[in-house]
């Protein structure tokens, strides 16, 4: 089981790689029921962690704007 401390220390890429491993293991059908339940729970936690990291990254993205007189500024990017 992945602890909250382990999750906090994981980068997006690390969490995504582990999530892909879990999906592969579940799709193989070779894991016993208890193991499947355990890794499914880990997968759900990893998915939430990845979504949190993506949302934080999205909020950091800024759009560079060229204003009057050539002044450059940044403003929050709009995503639809």
From Swiss-Prot:
Key word Coiled coil present: no
Catalysed transformations (reactions): Exonucleolytic cleavage in either 5'- to 3'- or 3'- to 5'-direction to yield nucleoside 5'-phosphates
Annotated keywords: Cytoplasm, Exonuclease, Hydrolase, Nuclease
One GO molecular-function entry: exodeoxyribonuclease VII activity
Matching InterPro entries: Exonuc_VII_S (IPR003761), Exonuc_VII_ssu_sf (IPR037004)
Gene3D superfamilies linked: Exonuclease VII, small subunit
Any one GO BP annotation for this protein: DNA catabolic process
Subcellular location(s) per record: Cytoplasm
Major place of residence: cytoplasm
Transmembrane residue ranges: none
EC number(s) on file: 3.1.11.6
One Gene Ontology CC term in the entry: cytosol
Source organism, top-level taxon: Bacteria
Primary role: Bidirectionally degrades single-stranded DNA into large acid-insoluble oligonucleotides, which are then degraded further into small acid-soluble oligonucleotides.
Assembly, per entry: Heterooligomer composed of large and small subunits.
Family: Belongs to the XseB family.
Protein name: Exodeoxyribonuclease 7 small subunit
Organism field: Caulobacter sp. (strain K31)
Gene behind the chain: xseB
